[in-house]
Every structure is written in structure tokens, then in C-alpha cells.
Design a protein with these regions (language model features):
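Conserved FAD-binding catalytic core of PHBH/FMO-like flavoproteins
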Residues: 118, 161, 165-270
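Core beta-strand elements of the Rossmann-like FAD/NAD(P) dinucleotide-binding domain
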Residues: 5-7, 152-161
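Active-site-adjacent segment of FAD-dependent monooxygenases/related oxidoreductases
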Residues: 46, 51-119
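N-terminal Rossmann-fold NAD(P) dinucleotide-binding loop
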Residues: 18-19
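Helical substrate-recognition/capping region of FAD-dependent monooxygenase/halogenase enzymes
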Residues: 1-8, 12, 27-28, 37, ...
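A conserved short coil-to-beta-strand element within the FAD-binding core of flavoproteins
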Residues: 130-144
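Glycine-rich FAD pyrophosphate-binding loop
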Residues: 26-46
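FAD/FMN-dependent oxidoreductases across multiple families
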Residues: 240-303, 323, 345, 382
Length: 490
């Protein structure tokens, strides 16, 4: 007797990535059971930065305004020498982003997790189970069976698909025997989170202090918090640097005694790792289970959330029966180049910051200060395109992030709904598109395109004639073309 399915997708791990994936799947009508070994949300700050693209994803889940209210928009990111000279200043405030949201947002991770779980609590399709550990996995042609253990004993759960969102030490990845490829960047740092009592005594910008005696990061966190990260030096042990008097010594030059109180201290090894395979049959990996990055570019959490957005609509298309499961192979081919670019940027920044040789540091300072003096500013990072996969190869704009124009307080995504969308020059004066017609016409014109098909994760499938786009989309997803006339979302 074949066992009935308990749900469509088992999500293992309910950090931000698992919670976002479950919420996105529920929106697509896919049932999930999310398993989390901890009974409570991890109460202390971890990730502190997300970008405009993640705010746009949160907008889809109805959380953008509530997260914006408790986040702080980063004004600038400065690299300074040991004596305080500005080596590079990257202005972030007032930067227009393709999504219309602030380019750089500093936040408190437990707050985000609470808000995401609130979305799940309101969805009949999402079943959250806390205090549950996965002890064994088995898969066959039809589904995955997980043996799980909790205070109520052991049981088995059966699902069509399983996604491991269970972090850097992923049980799911280990159970599948998937190896990691390592960038060979491995630096231990002390991370300190503080509650702020007097904000007037703290820096207003995010700082990298390129001090060869001890490279240091000092950044905003969510409302009422600040973070310092100190590189550990050869010979130092975690016990030594975690001692309160040692930490007070590190903070002394910042002159914040009385202005902050310690909330959390932890030693982390910053490294760059990518799982060699993100899919094994009916089991997939997302977030830190699939890749880990040093924090210097603020892209760790962002990368995991992009995974969730890429995977959710594809799983939904396969589960609804229209798409061939091979569509899921495009998940890694599209996301891995994006992830590797983010990791390589973070490591390059880390190598600039982590110089401890005084002579090499002096040369770096001189070179960076000369560029700063000459007015040479780093270009804003271009939104990363997805790699080859579910896109109309060779068409202009394929794989780019499609922008979200705003018209007064109306936003394109909110008007058009979850997608996919087919937007053509011919329908720009429709009531739904008219407020955004100028921006959309400009986008199409820049790519000499008659029409564009935008996927549910807001990446461009391709440009061309509406017929060619419909045919191409159907070949990939099995679903009929999206309606030409976008329907306003209710």
C-alpha cells in the first residue's frame, strides 16, 4: 500500500529562508510542513543587512512596510585607515534601486523571523512544527520519507519534495552525502551585538576599519542596536576574546562606555563554501545549507532569500503537474553563479580588510586614499543576473532582475500580482499598466523589445514577440502563457 502524502513539501529548518520558502509556497497553493529543531526563535541578532531585492520579496508576503518601520536605512559604507582617514566611501542613502525600496537596510533578524512566522500562522497550507529533529531520510520515484523525532516520540512524514533550509551544519546535506567546495577563505572573528542607550555617541555610517593591528567592522543593526566585529589574531583563543574584560578593551577606543550594553558575543569562522549539488532527486538545499559567505558584502541572508524565491514558483509548477521536474535543475544553474559572484565579492572585500602586515596595509591605504582623493568611487554593485536556465537564451534582458516602478504609492508588483507577467508595448495603456507606462516603455526600448515575460521571482524570462515568449514559457513550465492583460491583484 503506498503511503499517502502528509504534504507537498517538507521544509527542514525554519530560519528566515525556510520561513520565506514556506510562505511563498503557501501563496502558490502548495501545502508545507516546516520542521524546526528549536522550540523558540533564536533570540539574538545574526544577519543584520538585506537589500532592496529582499524588501521586494517581503513586499510580496505583505511585510515590507512593517520591516521598513523597524529597519534602518544605511547611509554609507566607509573604509577607514587605522588613523581614521577615509579610504573609500560608498554612498547608499538616496540611491535609487531597481525595486524602489532602499538599497541597503539594517535589521534585527529575530524581528524578521517573527514577522515571517506570523504570515505562516495565518496560512491554512503551512503547518509549523517546533522541537522536531530529522533523524533519517529516504526517497523513491514519488516522494521523500523523513523519520523525525520530538518529545512525542518518533514518526515518519511523507512529502512529494523536501527542502533542507537547515543551515551551515545541514543535517539534510549530510544525509545526502553532498560535499562542499571551499574557497579557502577562513578567518575567525569575534562578533559583538550591543543595545544602544545613547545613539548620539555612535557612528551613523557602516564602517570597516582597515587596521593591521586588528581589522574591525562597526555597523548599524536594527533599531536600537549596533554591531562590532573584531578579527582574531594568531594565537588568540575563543575563551580569551569572549571574556568581558577583553571585550571592554576592544571597545575602549570607540568611547561608548555607558552608551551601549552587551547583548551577545560569539566567535565565528568567516568562510566561503558552496555545496557541489543543490538537488538530489526529490531533495533540495537552500540558504546556508547550500552556500556560506563571509559577511563583508552583507549578502548571506539575501542569497538564501533569493534561493527561496527562485525555488518556490518552480516547485509549485512541478507539483501542479504542468512542469517537468527537470525545471528544478535550473535552480542551481541559475542561482550558483549569482551566489559565487556574491561570495567572491565578499572575499575580495575581506582580503582588503584583513591585511595584518603593516607594510602591505600602508600600500593599500595609499592606493585607496589616492582613488578617493581623485574622486574615483566604486560603482554601485549591479544587480546580479541569474545564470543559464529557465530563460529565453539570447534574448535581450533575459536573466536580469525586472525593475519595480512606483507611481505615487502604487507599486508595479502590487498591481500585477504574483506573476508571471507578459508586458508588451501594445498593452502599456491598459488601466493596470498606465501609471507605469513611461518606465516600462523605457525598459522595453532600451532592449529593442516588443514584449517581456517576467517570472514570478521577478527575473526576466526573455524579450521578443508575445507569441515567441508564450511558446518559450510553455516549453519550460508546461503552463499556458500568462494573460496578456495583467489582472489587478485583489
Amino acid at each position: 500500500v503506498t503511503r499517502a502524502f502528509d504534504c507537498d513539501v517538507l521544509v527542514v529548518g525554519l530560519g528566515p529562508v525556510g520561513a520565506a520558502l514556506s510562505a511563498l509556497l503557501a501563496r502558490q497553493g502548495v501545502s508545507t510542513i516546516a520542521l524546526e529543531k528549536d522550540l523558540d526563535i533564536y533570540p539574538l541578532p545574526r544577519a543584520v543587512h538585506f537589500d532592496h531585492e529582499i524588501m521586494r520579496l517581503l513586499q510580496k508576503l505583505g511585510l515590507a512596510d512593517s520591516m521598513l518601520a523597524v529597519s534602518r536605512v544605511a547611509r554609507a559604507y566607509e573604509f577607514r585607515s587605522a588613523d581614521g582617514q577615509i579610504l573609500m566611501r560608498y554612498e547608499q542613502a538616496g540611491q535609487s534601486s531597481p525595486s524602489g525600496w532602499p538599497a541597503s537596510n539594517m535589521f534585527h533578524q529575530p524581528t524578521l523571523e517573527n514577522q515571517l512566522r506570523g504570515v505562516l500562522a495565518g496560512s491554512p497550507l503551512a503547518d509549523v512544527r517546533l522541537g522536531v529533529t530529522v533523524t533519517a531520510l529516504a526517497q523513491d520515484d514519488a516522494g521523500v520519507t523523513a523519520t523525525v523525532s520530538s518529545a512525542n516520540g518518533d514518526q515518519t512524514l511523507r512529502a512529494r519534495w523536501l527542502v533542507g533550509c537547515d543551515g551551515g551544519r545541514s543535517t539534510v546535506r549530510t544525509a545526502c552525502g553532498i560535499e562542499l567546495s571551499d574557497y579557502g577563505f577562513d578567518e575567525p572573528w569575534l562578533v559583538i551585538d550591543a543595545m544602544v542607550h545613547d545613539a548620539s555617541r555612535l557612528p551613523v555610517d557602516n564602517l570597516q576599519i582597515c587596521d593591521p593591528a586588528r581589522p574591525t567592522t562597526c555597523v548599524l543593526s536594527g533599531e536600537g542596536r549596533h554591531r562590532w566585529e573584531f578579527m582574531m589574531l594568531p594565537g588568540e583563543t575563543p575563551d580569551q576574546v569572549l571574556a568581558d574584560d577583553f571585550i571592554q578593551g576592544l571597545l575602549a577606543p570607540w568611547n561608548v562606555a555607558g552608551a551601549v550594553s552587551l547583548e551577545r558575543k560569539a566567535v565565528y569562522r568567516f568562510h566561503g563554501l558552496v555545496a557541489q549539488s543543490w538537488r538530489q532527486g526529490r531533495i533540495l538545499l537552500a540558504g546556508d545549507a547550500a552556500h556560506q559567505t563571509p559577511p563583508f558584502a552583507g549578502q548571506g541572508l539575501c542569497s538564501g532569500m533569493r534561493d527561496a524565491d527562485n525555488l518556490a514558483w518552480k516547485l509549485a509548477a512541478v507539483i501542479r503537474g504542468s512542469a517537468d521536474p527537470a525545471l528544478l535543475d535550473s535552480y542551481q544553474t541559475e542561482r550558483e553563479p549569482q551566489v559565487r559572484a556574491a561570495i567572491e565579492l565578499a572575499i575580495a572585500m575581506g582580503r582588503v580588510v584583513c591585511i595584518t602586515d603593516r607594510q602591505a596595509a600602508a600600500q593599500r591605504d595609499q592606493a585607496m586614499a589616492a582613488q578617493q582623493a581623485a574622486g574615483i568611487r566604486p560603482p554601485p554593485p549591479a544587480p546580479l543576473s541569474i545564470g543559464p536556465g529557465c530563460r529565453l537564451e539570447g534574448s535581450a534582458g533575459a536573466g536580469e532582475l525586472f525593475p519595480q516602478p512606483w507611481s505615487d504609492d502604487r507599486k508595479l508588483d502590487a498591481i500585477l500580482g504574483d506573476g508571471p507577467w507578459l508586458i508588451s508595448k501594445a498593452n502599456l495603456d491598459s488601466p493596470a499598466l498606465k501609471p507605469f507606462a513611461g518606465d516600462l516603455a523605457g525598459w522595453l526600448q532600451a532592449r529593442s523589445a516588443e514584449a517581456v515575460l517576467v517570472r514570478p521571482d521577478r527575473y526576466v524570462f526573455g524579450t521578443g514577440t508575445p507569441d515567441a515568449l508564450s511558446t518559450g514559457w510553455q516549453a519550460w513550465t508546461g503552463s499556458p502563457s500568462p494573460v496578456l492583460e495583467p489582472v489587478p491583484s485583489r
